[in-house]
Regions:
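Helix-to-loop junction immediately C-terminal to a conserved catalytic motif
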Residues: 63
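Catalytic Walker B motif of ABC-type/P-loop ATPase nucleotide-binding domains
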Residues: 169-173
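Short, charged/small-residue-rich alpha-helical element at the C-terminal edge
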Residues: 239-313, 321
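Conserved ABC ATPase "signature" region
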Residues: 111, 115, 122-140
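ABC transporter nucleotide-binding domain
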Residues: 186-274
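Conserved ABC ATPase signature
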Residues: 144-148
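Conserved ABC transporter NBD signature motif
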Residues: 71-79, 86-87
């Protein structure tokens, strides 16, 4: 997965999102201190960081809802500070929580959203039908939005973000409240939208799901984007792999016999986590186990790449710079 952190925000790139040296404070609190990155068209870019790292403030600036104190932002080559009215039709913004106009039906809410972009009533009615089918709210189309569950309101919020067929999507925790099937459907939809050439920037605390959909990643901590060097160093650090065997307790001695010091997984008496320096090291351990007759039933990283990299950045001791 590519990292698109500080130092990669120039080069005359017009399409997608380009952010350079952006800062934003609220009084004495610096929410975003120094953010630079590029989000490319045609791929999903993950926005990753702990609580309080500045993700939501950054998304609000990209959505033209906050002005940066310093730095520059370009959405499809347009400055959202100087030309917000030109940028907004290009954007689809899905916040973590958004009011759903409780007394309107799902259909009416989508029709009104579409009409706000200047479309005719017939065009908005047709677009609402498309959006309802796209997010799977057909059975609820003529029900008031107040009866929707949390997950159903998320689907409605996504549909509203897509109302004007945007080139750039900004999604803050889009899978929150969705059931497992709906999460899979969301992942497939995002990949399809990216495949159509859209720029998608998505923030989520569920890193395993981001791993499955994101091609690039932006890492934030205390309002600062991680440098390419910091991300590379974090990825180069050792990684835990989970190993299981059909041979039960024989796995421990087998690992020790090839020079590996296993740490038993408390919740699984037959499994171990093993620290590997890289994939070549992991491949060598697996080959040695199989050659020694161990019947390996599971051999995989204990965490996804995003989680591993974020942990490596947090454990570097000097911040993420």
């Amino acid at each position: 997965m590519g990292a698109v952190g500080a130092g990669e925000g120039g080069g005359g790139v017009a399409a997608g999102i380009v952010v350079e040296g952006v800062r934003r404070s609220f009084g004495s609190v610096a929410a975003v201190r120094d953010v630079s990155f590029v989000a490319r068209p045609g791929v999903v870019t993950a926005l990753v960081g702990p609580n309080g790292s500045g993700k939501t403030t950054l998304l609000l600036m990209l959505a033209t809802l906050l002005r940066p104190d310093a730095g520059s932002i370009r959405i499809e080559g347009i400055d959202p500070v100087a030309q917000p009215a030109a940028v907004r039709p290009l954007l689809g913004w899905m916040p973590d929580a958004l009011g759903s106009w409780a007394n309107l039906t799902v259909r009416s809410a989508l029709e009104i959203t579409h009409r706000l972009y200047g479309h005719s009533r017939p065009a908005s009615a047709a677009r609402a039908v498309e959006l309802i089918a796209l997010v799977g709210l057909g059975e609820l189309a003529d029900r008031p939005t107040r009866v929707l569950s949390r997950g159903q309101k998320q689907k409605l919020s996504l549909a509203r973000a897509l109302a004007n067929d945007p080139r750039v999507l900004l999604l803050d925790e889009p899978a929150s409240g969705l059931d497992p099937v709906a999460r899979i459907e969301l992942r497939e939809l995002l990949l399809r939208l990216a495949g159509e050439g859209r720029t998608i920037l998505i923030s989520s605390h569920v890193l395993s799901e981001l791993d499955e959909v994101a091609t690039d990643a932006v890492y934030l901590d205390h309002g600062v984007t991680a440098s390419q060097e910091a991300v590379a160093a974090a990825r180069a650090s050792s990684r835990l792999w989970r190993v299981k065997s059909l041979d039960g307790f024989a796995l421990g001695p087998a690992l020790e016999g090839i020079g590996v010091d296993p740490v038993r997984i408390a919740s699984d008496s037959q499994g171990f986590t093993v620290s590997m320096t890289d994939e070549a090291d992991a491949a060598a351990v697996l080959a040695a186990l199989v050659a020694g007759g161990t019947r390996v039933s599971w051999f995989a990283p204990a965490s996804g790449e995003l989680e591993r990299t974020l942990q490596g950045l947090a454990g570097s001791g000097g911040g993420i710079r």
